[in-house]
Amino acid sequence: MTDIVIVNGARTAMGGFQGSLASVTAPELGAACIKEAIARAGLQATDVEEVIMGCVLPAGLKQGPARQAMRQAGLPDSTGAVTINKLCGSGMKAVMQAADMIKAGSAEIVVAGGMESMTNAPYVLPKARGGLRMGHGEIKDHMFLDGLEDAETGRLMGSFAQDMANTRGYTREQMDDFAIRSLERAQKAVNEGYFADEIVPVTVSSRKGDIVVDKDEQPFNANIAKIPTLRPAFAKDGTITAANASSISDGASALVLTSADNAAAKGLKPLAKIVAYATNSQHPSEFTIAPVGAIQKVLNKTGWNAQDVDLWEINEAFAMVTMCPMDDFKLDPAKVNINGGACALGHPVGSSGSRIILTLIHALKRTGGKKGIATLCIGGGEATAVAIELL
């Protein structure tokens, strides 16, 4: 079977909650990435047969967010589109499904990624349709209800992370130190232009004129000196805070996939090949350590050991999520999230899975590495991982 390759990709800068991208919808963010990724790949819009975009918070976005994004990107009506929701793994699962489609012969060229405007997630009235007959009605936050809370218990994802941090013995100081390192790396990456080849600028119109958003917003909103003084977020005497957890964010990303044979036939120059991918699933309360199993499955499929991997992108939903596989696989901290992670950059939930693959590719290019693994935890007890190799 011919290899599946990533020809190119693009992402938006990540905006903070109610920040620089607040007026832009998820499909609009997705459209910018789809259009730019196709252009960077050296393809025409008519070459793409299918678009798969993750989106975790679709309420109020109107019919078919991926279809909207595809059409706004200028693709023809004959192009198929599907929106998928695997929570924080949506963008990565989109890439995995695209690879499966190409392997199966269902399509030759697929755009896959994710998009999210957490800022614009609406409030919902679950009982309004049947009639709020008497007394007080409850308004629920779509972001919390469908994104950040466990479906069975209603507990916030961070409360499970706090439990696991306690179980693993991670201290507040350890997690704060991790978050500070992530922030320092992210600030350096932005200042040095390390993300420039990833990002497609987004123009935001306002009464004050047009503003071009082309840099990640959140690394410069944080005050390192205040990190040790922040209050616990999920338990009175807890150790997880807003700083050593990921930020609520807006953003999108997209990758162009095809087979190595098709890329050669069309004269394309792929950036990387997908070597393996895997999903690991366990009890919902243990989602924060699920990446450990996903990584092991991918290592088994590739025949690599952890020390063969040049760089890692392990999504920082919480600092402790990344710390677990770092400890279990004895990873060199200098090889993990070298440009910072979600604690500093943000975590637009539908996009992060594809975003970290794109960031990993460019980090490998910049540092002269070849092999990389990207992974992230997923609410409900799951994780996905993708192993890539630069071409």
Predicted segments with their positions:
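Conserved active-site "lid/cap" helical segment
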Residues: 1-61, 65-73, 80, 160-172, ...
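Condensing-enzyme catalytic core mediating Claisen C-C bond formation in acyl metabolism
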Residues: 1-25, 139, 222-289, 293, ...
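N-terminal extracellular/periplasmic Venus flytrap/periplasmic-binding protein-like
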Residues: 10-12, 23-32, 40, 174-265, ...
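Conserved catalytic cysteine-centered active-site region
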Residues: 55-110, 151-157, 221-247, 328-355, ...
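Active-site-proximal alpha-helical scaffold in enzymes
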Residues: 84-116, 165-194, 254-261, 326, ...
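Flexible glycine-/small-residue-enriched beta->alpha junction loops
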Residues: 109-163
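Active-site pocket-lining segment
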Residues: 159-162, 198, 205-206, 275-344
